[in-house]
Amino acid sequence: MAIGLIGRKVGMTRIFTEDGVSIPVTVIEVAGNRVTQVKTLETDGYRALQVTTGTKKANRITKPEAGHFAKSGVEAGRGLWEMRLVDGEGEGIEVGAELNVDIFADVAKVDVTGQSKGKGFQGGVKRWNFRTQDMTHGNSLSHRSNGSIGQNQTPGRVFKGKKMSGHMGAERVTTQNLVVVRVDVERNLLLVRGAVPGATNGDLIIKPAVKA
């Protein structure tokens, strides 16, 4: 099953098992996901569900967005997300339908995608876990520098993709095979074991694990 949901990271806490074992969990609020468009092979060339969730101020909605939401008869949400469907998935789901966290009731593990926390401009040691150079023994300037980044006159350049200093974080990250600890349908909460990408209140895409 590839149908997933959009949630919001509430934060982390812990729960205790009957044996008294402490389990760190991330609490994800999964409010109703409203279907705004159903894409088909005939009209779009592929099958997918487009959903929205949450709310958005009227003065923050562009005219194209307003027209799109009005056409689907769905309240404007804080964004639009699309999930591809394979043959046999999503049959019977129509525009205006609402998907809730109960679809994970029988799911053991999930993959969670979000935007990682931005760290700004960082050096090679922090960004790529490079080893530091000697703190003494004659080294007084290059303790945390990258070291050699190329060869000589041949090739006479630095290869593309070379791990160097630069902007760290603020990129799309997926954490796979997180165990579903609890599904709270009444409060629209999903508890998964461990940490998920991103900061508090960040949007998350939750899907059944592909490697489970």
Swiss-Prot record:
One GO molecular-function entry: rRNA binding
One Pfam family in the UniProt entry: Ribosomal_L3
Modified residues (N5-methylglutamine): 153
InterPro entries: Ribosomal_uL3, Ribosomal_uL3_bac/org-type, Ribosomal_uL3_CS, Transl_B-barrel_sf
Keyword list, A-Z: Methylation, Ribonucleoprotein, Ribosomal protein, RNA-binding, rRNA-binding
Taxonomy, superkingdom: Bacteria
Region (Disordered), start-end ranges: 136-155
HAMAP family in UniProt: Ribosomal_uL3_B
Protein name stated in the entry: Large ribosomal subunit protein uL3
